[in-house]
UniProtKB/Swiss-Prot annotation:
Keyword Phosphoprotein: no
GO MF annotation: an example: neutral L-amino acid:sodium symporter activity
Organism: Campylobacter fetus subsp. fetus (strain 82-40)
Keywords attached to this entry: Amino-acid transport, Cell inner membrane, Cell membrane, Membrane, Symport, Transmembrane, Transmembrane helix, Transport
Stated role: Involved in the import of serine and threonine into the cell, with the concomitant import of sodium (symport system).
Full protein name: Serine/threonine transporter SstT
GO CC terms of this entry: plasma membrane
Record's catalysed reaction(s): L-serine(in) + Na(+)(in) = L-serine(out) + Na(+)(out); L-threonine(in) + Na(+)(in) = L-threonine(out) + Na(+)(out)
Keyword Signal: no
């Protein structure tokens, strides 16, 4: 028992990124051997696939209640304050997140990516044919019974009820707010536990994918990662630069490079916007910004300024759409941009938060929850790099927008 406890503690205290890399490596090797018609390896892969299915099943079970609680509690608990210029910062956060999502959609159309998914035959039956059908389905999903929405994984209904509950309880008693905060923290702990098991699940998923499709599957992940990282860099150096220039009419790059050097680099390694708040506060002080403003805007940005998350949600959702050969028009893509931006605002405070909101975007196109959760699992496979870049973009943009809003106000 002592040895088991020691091994468990060693695993839980270990570096998740390294553990996931080990899982990917072992799964890839095992899958490759099985792909070359090794009977023994194929038997092991079949057993390993159970780990992948269990991981996806756990994600599928926790995701609906997670989305509801995170979005509702973020509206109920967050105190926005009255600091001068805060309204401008909130507008910048929302506009920046939407433009990031729109950029991701455009890049995905130019460089379409596909994934290796299982059991996709049933997913095509419910694919919508036009924006009218999408909007009709959207409206009916919004008025779904909240209990049914959570139990069936209707993420549009969940989001609608979460926002409604948040607004309705915005001015509730301190005790009520504390209950929602405690529930939110409890759900977050459950998700963290599931994420800790990711190396085993990813081992099973990679082994199964490579055994079925060879290293073609891993090549698909590499292209997907290239599109994700490329889009995030485009947002950081082009979209954000355009926003800064539009607001200040000054060369944006000195400020952008300062934010990347002193905020993004730290966030890249911590992979947490919340953990990077002290770093951002220190940078704001160094830039001589208004303390009353940044003391509110930086923690707020760690919650709602999620450009990187919006990119992840949009790119991975469109990868699923491409894989299933669903035709997407301009208005469909615009609606996806809006939904991805709204969903991204609720992605903070939990490991892999942006990935857990992918089913919300996928549901716009009638993609089943089973398929959407396979896409989430793919996100965890590439998450070693994706999550780091995403957090770096999210966190550094908090300081960037606070700085330009301070100049404006």
């Amino acid at each position: 028992m002592g040895m088991f406890t020691k091994l468990t503690k060693s695993y839980t205290d270990g570096n998740l990124i390294i553990q996931i890399l080990i899982g990917i490596t072992i799964g890839g090797i095992l899958g490759f051997i099985a792909h070359k018609s090794s009977v023994e390896a194929a038997i092991v892969v079949n057993a390993a696939s159970m780990l992948g299915n269990l991981f996806v099943g756990a994600l599928k079970a926790v995701a609906p209640i997670l989305v509801f609680i995170l979005v509702a509690s973020s509206i109920i608990i967050k105190e926005f304050g009255q600091a001068n210029g805060l309204k401008n910062i909130i507008i910048l956060y929302l506009v920046g997140t939407f433009l990031a999502s729109l950029s991701a959609v455009v890049v995905s159309f130019i460089f379409p990516t596909t994934l290796v998914l299982q059991n996709t035959s049933n997913a095509l039956a419910s694919a919508p044919q036009s924006i009218i059908v999408v909007l009709k389905d959207l409206v009916f999903k919004m008025v779904d019974n909240p209990v049914h929405a959570i139990s069936s994984g209707n993420y549009i209904g969940i989001l609608t009820w979460a926002i409604g509950t948040g607004i309705a309880l915005r001015h509730s008693s301190i005790e009520t707010k504390k209950i929602f905060k405690d529930i939110s923290e409890g759900i977050t702990r459950i998700v963290k536990f599931i994420i800790k098991l990711a190396p085993f699940g990813i081992f099973g998923l990679v082994a199964t994918s490579v055994a079925e499709a060879g290293f073609e599957a891993i090549g698909g992940y590499a292209k997907l990662l290239l599109v994700l990282v490329g889009t995030m860099l485009f947002v950081a150096f082009v979209v954000n630069a355009a926003i800064v220039y539009f607001v200040t009419k000054q060369n944006p790059y000195p400020l952008i490079m300062t934010c990347i050097k002193e905020s993004a680099v730290t966030a890249f390694f911590t992979r947490s916007s919340a953990a990077n708040i002290p770093v951002n506060m220190s940078l704001c002080k160094k830039l001589n910004l208004d303390e009353k403003l940044y003391s509110i805007s930086i923690p707020l940005g760690a919650t709602i300024n999620m450009a990187g998350a919006a990119v992840t949600i949009a790119v991975l959702s469109l990868s699923a759409v491409n894989t299933l050969n669903i035709q997407v028009g301009f208005l469909d893509a615009l609606l996806l941009s809006i939904i991805a931006a709204i969903g991204a605002c609720g992605a903070s405070g939990v490991a892999g938060g942006s990935l857990m909101l992918i089913p919300l975007a996928c549901s716009l196109f009638g993609i089943s929850n089973d398929i959407a959760m396979q896409v989430v699992a793919v996100g965890f496979i590439i998450g070693v790099v994706q999550d780091s870049i995403e957090t770096a973009l999210n966190s550094s943009t908090d300081v960037l927008f606070t700085a330009i809003a301070s100049q404006k106000s």
